[in-house]
């Protein structure tokens, strides 16, 4: 995939129905082809953990690659939500986990497009659960 096409992945996000937008805690959902995805920004002590999940029947869910064929609109929607969150909340630290190595490139692109321009620097750390991105605000004044 060429780089221009790669960046266009971000251009068509779906609308998110936000159930909670309270301070640093945001929770919402969006649907693609009758499948529901949840997105959550869990904020504690200046650190925000980001997760998104394909909801399955009987409350089973999947945080990994789901094989639904919807990865492009899912990623575009999540990436734009991260951009909106950083713009409005500007947490000191934002973290998320790439459980599959194939997702690392996508997450780097998301950070470079939506988080780095807001004054964050990021690292990638190996954990027992996957690779964790940790983006740290350079300074409180770097927000805009």
Where are each of the predicted segments found?
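Non-catalytic substrate-recognition and accessory regions of acyl/acetyltransferase enzymes
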Residues: 1-144
């Amino acid at each position: 995939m060429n780089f221009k096409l790669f960046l266009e992945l971000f251009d068509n996000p779906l609308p998110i129905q936000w159930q909670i937008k309270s301070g640093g805690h945001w929770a919402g959902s969006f649907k693609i082809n009758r499948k529901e995805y949840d997105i959550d920004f869990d904020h504690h002590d200046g650190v925000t953990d980001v997760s998104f999940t394909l909801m399955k029947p009987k409350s089973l869910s999947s945080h990994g690659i789901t094989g639904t064929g919807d990865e492009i609109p899912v990623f575009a929607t999540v990436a734009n939500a991260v951009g909106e969150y950083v713009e409005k909340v500007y947490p000191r630290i934002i973290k998320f986990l790439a459980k599959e190595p194939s997702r690392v490139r996508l997450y780097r692109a998301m950070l470079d497009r939506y988080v780095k321009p807001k004054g964050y620097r990021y690292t990638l750390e190996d954990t027992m659960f996957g690779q964790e991105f940790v983006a740290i605000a350079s300074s409180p004044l770097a927000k805009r």
